[in-house]
Amino acid sequence: MFLARLTSRLARTVVPWAGFSRSCPGSGVIGSYAFRPLYSLQPASPSRAASLPGKRTQSELEEFLVPRKMAISPLESWLTAQYLLPRRNVEVPVTLAPSQFYECPPRQGEEEAQQGVREAWDATPVQCKNVLKIRRRKMNHHKYRKLVKRTRFLRRKVREGRLKKKQIKFEKDLKRIWLKAGLKEAPENWQTPKIYLKNK
């Protein structure tokens, strides 16, 4: 209601000035062009008049595109906030009632579990240095296992060569013992045991 009265008063004050400016003839050529509208509201031809929509259709289209409840001008919003909404009393201090908190009873065994976790953490303190040491040890072991797998045939060949050398040395020691005992040759049906070359 208040907004309707205010807008009607503003329209009354603005309309006479608009009529005066339109009715006042301009002096000279410059004045006539100053108050002459740059466009014409009347259609130029009957075909153009038939193509243009009516005022009712245009207003319905505007209401459909921009509803009146959503289209609020800044003036209307300011007037609504200034006169219709209740004002806040600054002098009266606002006191907020403290909310009541209720402590729920603990569950059975929860305190014991928490105590056990605390004791475990206290017994085995975890440090960044210890974690890095463990990770480095695991990585070194992993690299060593990969190296062993990659060089297993080469190491087998080296090991077999060492065993052959040990077997030859063992046979030489046996021959030296025979000669020292007074035997020129080994006894009949004697086979030198293959101690180091078990698979051969």
From Swiss-Prot:
Subcellular location: Mitochondrion matrix; Nucleus
One Pfam assignment: COX24_C
SMART domains cross-referenced by the UniProt entry: DUF1713
Gene Ontology CC annotation, any one: anaphase-promoting complex
GO BP term (any one): mitochondrial translation
PANTHER family, alphabetized: AURORA KINASE A-INTERACTING PROTEIN, SMALL RIBOSOMAL SUBUNIT PROTEIN MS38
Family according to the record: Belongs to the mitochondrion-specific ribosomal protein mS38 family.
Summary of the function given for this chain in its UniProt record: May act as a negative regulator of Aurora-A kinase, by down-regulation through proteasome-dependent degradation.
Protein name: Small ribosomal subunit protein mS38
Source species: Mus musculus
